Curated annotation (Swiss-Prot):
Pathway: Porphyrin-containing compound metabolism; heme A biosynthesis; heme A from heme O: step 1/1. The keyword RNA-binding does not apply. It is an enzyme of class 1 (oxidoreductase). Belongs to the COX15/CtaA family. Type 2 subfamily. The lineage of its organism: Bacteria, Pseudomonadati, Pseudomonadota, Alphaproteobacteria, Hyphomicrobiales. This is Heme A synthase.
Length: 362
């Protein structure tokens, strides 16, 4: 065994712990963002100050200034006129906490990355990927403000499309970190039929589409309408005149409450059916760890479907809505792991974390 091979487990472990903690922080960030949306707190801070905005108001004068800023936007004038300073503080803390967590994640990612690079602990083939993840994180901060800005001038809420982009980008970053963690583990590949790989990839792609659709539902508050199941608007499939009345037709996919909720339901049915097929196929093929992964993915999707139905029937209580969002993250995690285990190549060496140069070893 070479010295590099002997050192690999010891050198990989700190990197994997770091990425695991970052992934956990992102998952928490997504849930805090969900709570911020559900409590209608996302527009309480009307400025974007990436550095100086780290500190909250520290005295009465600063609190009054922040409140006066909120009073200038349509949401206050049309929905919250008469709100007290105490009520404003409640929504302010949600948004401030969400933004602070974003800053914490940036620091928790960048500083250890620089440390590992300085120590020579990351192999060249991973440097570009890790920097790309950081770049996506920086972009996510800008997208977050782009989303908030959509609700500051003419709307009483943020754009549902920008909200969906913001959430989906966060989950893409999360998925990239989960993928990297799995590859760094260096587990042996699973021999499986091409159809299993195809359905696993399809499940991951459709999961991301479904999460985007769910964000559209949330942004439009469409979950507070058509609160029946399995019927929607009195039918299994609503009338075309109700689904496609806006012009041009494609606007219905983003702006029509009925169409957006119907699309989210139909995608859920498709995902559940595909996951069931994938699990049965993996079991019949005796695909080893992939069979277990397929069963876990199907179980998580089944739980997610139940939570989605309950969230709809009870008209989006915060607890159920956040549970639905949390299980969505679990589904995405399992989908990423399933694709990774089925697409790992035998011909390639397992991803390496390089030992530090002798001069830098402690």
């Amino acid at each position: 065994m070479t010295a590099a091979a002997e050192l690999r487990p010891r050198r990989v472990r700190p990197v994997r712990i770091w990425l695991t903690l970052v992934a956990m922080l992102i998952a928490v960030m997504v849930l805090v963002g969900g709570a911020t949306r559900l409590t209608e707190s996302g527009l309480s801070i009307v400025e974007w100050k990436p550095v100086t905005g780290t500190l909250p108001p520290l005295n009465d004068a600063q609190w009054r200034d922040a409140f006066e800023g909120y009073k200038t936007i349509p949401q206050y004038r049309e929905l919250n006129a008469g709100m007290t300073l105490g009520e404003f503080k409640t929504i302010f803390w949600w948004e401030w906490g969400h933004r602070l967590l974003g800053r914490v994640i940036g620091i928790a990612y960048l500083l250890p990355l620089l440390w590992f690079l300085w120590r020579g602990a990351i192999a060249p083939e991973w440097k570009r990927a890790l920097w790309a993840i950081f770049a996506l994180g920086a972009l996510q901060g800008a997208v977050g403000w782009w989303m908030v800005a959509s609700g500051l001038s003419q709307r009483t809420e943020v754009s549902q499309v920008r909200l969906a982009i913001h959430l989906t980008l966060a989950l893409v970053i999360y998925a990239a970190i989960v993928w990297t963690l799995r590859r760094l583990a260096g587990r042996p590949p699973i021999v499986a039929a091409a159809r299993l790989k195809f359905t696993a990839i399809a499940l991951l792609a459709l999961t991301l589409v479904q999460l985007f659709l769910g964000a559209l539902v949330a942004g439009l508050r469409a979950g507070r309408m058509f609160n029946t199941w399995p019927l929607i608007d009195g039918a299994l499939i609503p009338e075309a005149s109700r689904l496609w009345f806006e012009q041009p037709w494609w606007k219905n996919l983003f702006d029509n409450h009925l169409t957006v909720q119907f699309d989210h339901r139909m995608m859920a049915y498709a995902l559940w059916a595909l996951a069931a097929w994938h699990a049965i196929d993996a079991l019949r093929a005796r695909a080893g760890g992939a069979a277990g992964g397929a069963l876990w993915l199907f179980a998580a999707l089944s739980l997610q479907a139940v939570l989605g139905i309950l969230t709809l029937l009870y008209q989006v209580p915060i607890g159920l809505a956040l549970a639905h969002q949390a299980v969505g993250i679990v589904v995405l995690t399992l989908a990423v792991l399933q694709v990774e285990r089925l697409t790992a190549s035998k011909s390639k060496e397992a991803p390496r974390v390089m030992p530090a140069p002798a001069s830098q070893r402690g």
